[in-house]
Amino acid sequence: MGPRCTLHPLSLLVQVTALAAALAQGRLPAFLPCELQPHGLVNCNWLFLKSVPHFSAAAPRANVTSLSLLSNRIHHLHDSDFVHLSSLRTLNLKWNCPPAGLSPMHFPCHMTIEPNTFLAVPTLEELNLSYNSITTVPALPDSLVSLSLSRTNILVLDPTHLTGLHALRYLYMDGNCYYKNPCQGALEVVPGALLGLGNLTHLSLKYNNLTEVPRSLPPSLETLLLSYNHIVTLTPEDLANLTALRVLDVGGNCRRCDHARNPCRECPKDHPKLHSDTFSHLSRLEGLVLKDSSLYNLDTRWFRGLDRLQVLDLSENFLYDCITKTTAFQGLARLRSLNLSFNYHKKVSFAHLHLAPSFGHLRSLKELDMHGIFFRSLSETTLQPLVQLPMLQTLRLQMNFINQAQLSIFGAFPGLLYVDLSDNRISGAARPVAITREVDGRERVWLPSRNLAPRPLDTLRSEDFMPNCKAFSFTLDLSRNNLVTIQSEMFARLSRLECLRLSHNSISQAVNGSQFVPLTSLRVLDLSHNKLDLYHGRSFTELPRLEALDLSYNSQPFTMQGVGHNLSFVAQLPALRYLSLAHNDIHSRVSQQLCSASLCALDFSGNDLSRMWAEGDLYLRFFQGLRSLVWLDLSQNHLHTLLPRALDNLPKSLKHLHLRDNNLAFFNWSSLTLLPKLETLDLAGNQLKALSNGSLPSGTQLRRLDLSGNSIGFVNPGFFALAKQLEELNLSANALKTVEPSWFGSMVGNLKVLDVSANPLHCACGATFVGFLLEVQAAVPGLPSRVKCGSPGQLQGHSIFAQDLRLCLDETLSWNCFGISLLAMALGLVVPMLHHLCGWDLWYCFHLCLAWLPHRGQRRGADALFYDAFVVFDKAQSAVADWVYNELRVQLEERRGRRALRLCLEERDWLPGKTLFENLWASVYSSRKTLFVLAHTDRVSGLLRASFLLAQQRLLEDRKDVVVLVILRPDAYRSRYVRLRQRLCRQSVLLWPHQPRGQGSFWAQLGTALTRDNHHFYNRNFCRGPTTAE
């Protein structure tokens, strides 16, 4: 074992004193290892804590109102854990000790909560104990307003559990008994268990295997959630006293299993059973959820008396026929939202859908969801009852396999704001339907030969780039359909349309300015993920009010060899402000310059600007004509360098420049003066290794600089000092080992954000960056938890405030350890070299010297051997094993009287806990002889072979032949080794006689062979046998 360096007690005392002084002065973050966030929240999430942190008395603990300990490993809560937090109102202990079924590795866990843990916090109002293995409700303070006990192991609720919680308003107990958190039965709510909670307004008991509504619920309830249990019968008595109820969710209790996304129990036949007066007395009900309930019809009497009903969810049922003829909606004049999604017929796609006339009585309806009903034609008659609804704003018809759609019908809806027809099969303007035959009164049509296009992954875009369509008055979503071409007649009567989404289609036509003629009010057009041919110079010029145009991911035409592309249409769009040409692999044969007086944001990421600028001056002024451009994204353009002349030809109005994920290994910082208005520069994800060439120029307006994800390991002193306007600096995920105040100078006081996380900081004793980060800790996000050490190895991955004081050694001790380690290294080099050059000579001399030592040659006495014989045989052969245990063992150990032998058997005498080789070696060397019982000698492997080799090794080392062979079958004599051994040492090879009269002689010969040295058995005509040197 190498030398060990010890710590001087005085050095440790000095370090402890320094740390205590720093904490007393308030320099360290107050709530280490957690982070103090605005509004009194202390965030301790995902820190792998095993106990509740006890914050220092110097910390402003009285100001803590919220404490979040989400996703740690706290298994025991003590009475004193929260006593010092006198103002605590919100406590989150979710995901600390999850039940085995919810644990990622299914490890069992049990959380222990001492009796006064929460009683010691009289101000506590909100407590979250979800996803913890607790079996009973702990003692709680009477100030509690919200309590979450979801996904726990609490299976019984009785009146004693919640006694005194008169202020409780919200109680959540979801998922305590379901397929992910299984139990033997169901959650038991004792009648009247919740009756004492006079202020309870919200109760959630979802996923608990309940078979009936709990009895004697408090009449103050306004929200009752009982979905995904097994309540298949509802009567007026179940909800008798809940007259204040405003929201009732009983969906998923009698499920439609052909559409289930998780384990599902089939609904019993002739169920569910809903009494006609079940909801009639709930006059204040505003929201009713009956989704996934296997409903085939709607009883008009169910909605009798529900004059205030505003939200009705009937999705995932079997109401495909009911939708066309029901009268149940006639009395729901205040209904605002109706969900009928996935009420499809199994394996049937309807040719047409005609809504029942009762839809026309929903005068207050604002949102109608009918996706997943599966009908193939959308015509004027389909939605006829909805035309007269004055407040209808949102209509969802996606995922219906619609292949023929008359889009002009939406022009008759004056108040419509959003129509979603995405994920259908619309391929163009509606054509006459070809009727083939009628089956069961249901019209069938030919389905298109093409399949529904697979939905590709959505591409995330910056929120501050393309406008959100929710801000416009009318939006039509036709994304993820089968459109190949666009004809203007598709959009007849849609002049009011302001936002049109056509992404993820297969549009491959050349747009020439005639496709969108009717859309005179269109302001946003999304054509991403298509195959548009931008050849004509008048593309989109029929849209005079177009403000945002997304042409990203239309790369196929740009990758075709020899095909030109005309981008001059940009100059002819007077209102265009946002344009995306991202991820089109644009590299050649395009317009030499983009021109626009109105464009303020351009996304040109995911192209090949490096090849364009490599063509001399051909594309050098590509962006110069965009006189009003403020935001430019040139990320992922394979740029290896950015010359000053390239920056000089960017618009001078530019304020935000993004150059993420290029290959930039060098940046000329002085060239930033060429962009006088630049405020944001994003260079993340490049290959910068140092900030050593100059510094940020003085007078720059730069406010945000992102250098994350590079390999920066060195920064020049004063590099950021002249950038007086810099407020946000991101240096995360680089190779920085320190953060020096000399980099910033006097401008450090202007920084609002300084991100240095994910750097391999070197946490040496007295590191200056710790003190500097403490001075600017208000600007460093995640300082206690995200800023971590990269070295030394003992601290790698730990917080910079978790420094081990034992690593801080004084100088003398450090030099001593260095000298000892240097000596050890030298010996480590010299010894193997000497062993390689003259190892045999050294070995010979060493053993020659040992031979002269007294008692070296003394042989080990027979009394040192623990066994007379180690019996080796093939356990896989049951006959051999039976002979050893019932014949050999009995004869040698039990029937020889005082001459009984001590045998070593593997299954009886080997020690558990040792390795196989350790037991084998001990058995061979602790036995006088090694007895091999063989039924055959041609295939010897495994334990037999290893034992034989050890016996041979003992022959070489101790010059003792310890092998004795017992042959159970005569044909085993065919082995050459057996024949040779029988000739040299006949008494050590014995054959088991199958005649009873010869067995007595066999046992006598075997006893002699095991008790005498084999040296006496060798045939002197051939050899003398092995001898032991004295």
From Swiss-Prot:
Keywords in alphabetical order: Cytoplasmic vesicle, Disulfide bond, Endoplasmic reticulum, Endosome, Glycoprotein, Immunity, Inflammatory response, Innate immunity, Leucine-rich repeat, Lipoprotein, Lysosome, Membrane, Palmitate, Receptor, Repeat, Signal, Transmembrane, Transmembrane helix
Glycosylation sites: 63, 128, 199, 209, 241, 339, 512, 566, 668, 693, 730
TIR domain: residues covered: 865-1010
Signal peptide: 1-24
Pfam families named in the record: LRR_1, LRR_12, LRR_8, TIR
Cytoplasmic side: 838-1030
Topology of this chain in the membrane: Single-pass type I membrane protein
Coiled coil: none
Chain sites annotated for binding DNA: 46-50, 71-76, 94-108, 131, 151, 178-180, 207, 261
Residue pairs linked by disulfide bridges in the UniProt entry: 34-44, 97-109, 177-183, 254-267, 257-264, 469-499, 763-789, 765-808
Gene Ontology terms: biological process: canonical NF-kappaB signal transduction; cellular response to chloroquine; defense response to Gram-negative bacterium; defense response to virus; detection of molecule of bacterial origin; inflammatory response; innate immune response; maintenance of gastrointestinal epithelium
Entry GO MF terms: interleukin-1 receptor binding; pattern recognition receptor activity; protein homodimerization activity; siRNA binding; unmethylated CpG binding
Residues lipid-modified (S-palmitoyl cysteine): 257, 264
Keyword Transmembrane listed: yes
InterPro entries: Leu-rich_rpt (IPR001611), Leu-rich_rpt_typical-subtyp (IPR003591), LRR_12 (IPR041283), LRR_dom_sf (IPR032675), TIR_dom (IPR000157), Toll_tir_struct_dom_sf (IPR035897)
CC annotations in GO: apical plasma membrane; basolateral plasma membrane; early endosome membrane; early phagosome; endolysosome; endoplasmic reticulum; endoplasmic reticulum membrane; endosome
PTM text: Activated by proteolytic cleavage of the flexible loop between repeats LRR14 and LRR15 within the ectodomain. Cleavage requires UNC93B1. Proteolytically processed by first removing the majority of the ectodomain by either asparagine endopeptidase (AEP) or a cathepsin followed by a trimming event that is solely cathepsin mediated and required for optimal receptor signaling.
Gene3D superfamilies named in the record: Ribonuclease Inhibitor (3.80.10.10), Toll/interleukin-1 receptor homology (TIR) domain (3.40.50.10140)
Chief localisation class: endoplasmic reticulum
Stretches in topological domain Extracellular: 25-816
Top-level taxon of the source organism: Eukaryota
Subcellular locations according to the entry: Endoplasmic reticulum membrane; Endosome; Lysosome; Cytoplasmic vesicle, Phagosome
Keyword Glycoprotein: yes
Function: Key component of innate and adaptive immunity. TLRs (Toll-like receptors) control host immune response against pathogens through recognition of molecular patterns specific to microorganisms. TLR9 is a nucleotide-sensing TLR which is activated by unmethylated cytidine-phosphate-guanosine (CpG) dinucleotides. Acts via MYD88 and TRAF6, leading to NF-kappa-B activation, cytokine secretion and the inflammatory response. Upon CpG stimulation, induces B-cell proliferation, activation, survival and antibody production.
Family named by the database record: Belongs to the Toll-like receptor family.
Name recorded for this polypeptide: Toll-like receptor 9
Organism: Sus scrofa (Pig)
Gene that produces this protein: TLR9
